[in-house]
Design a protein with these regions (language model features):
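GIY-YIG nuclease catalytic motif and its immediate N-terminal context
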Residues: 1-44, 50-53, 58-59, 66-81, ...
């Protein structure tokens, strides 16, 4: 099958984590389960090493890294109240 007809691109995800101090961490990854496990084990971002995760609030899928990164940047500019409202619409079940 020609390469252009096969879908070899993995989706990217933006995820929001509520931390123990009730702040919200936003990140991107291709594997949410693996990345969340890294945050839980203290091997994730410095932010979540200092403020350990309480729960995964939301996960949003994107077709490519550029769109996910752009969305991550936008979300990081929001207030905690805006992030919580967004997370409520994209909650992890």
């Amino acid at each position: 099958m020609p390469k252009e007809l096969t879908n070899t691109h993995k989706p990217w995800f933006v995820y929001l984590i509520e931390c123990q101090d009730y702040s919200i961490y936003t990140g991107i990854t291709v594997n949410v389960e693996k990345r969340y496990a890294a945050h839980l084990s203290g091997k994730g971002a410095r932010y979540t090493r200092i403020r350990p995760p309480l729960k995964l609030l939301a996960v949003i899928e994107f077709a490519d890294r550029a769109t996910a990164a752009s969305t991550e940047y936008t979300i990081k500019q929001w207030t905690a109240k805006q992030k919580r409202a967004f997370a409520a619409q994209h909650a992890v079940i």
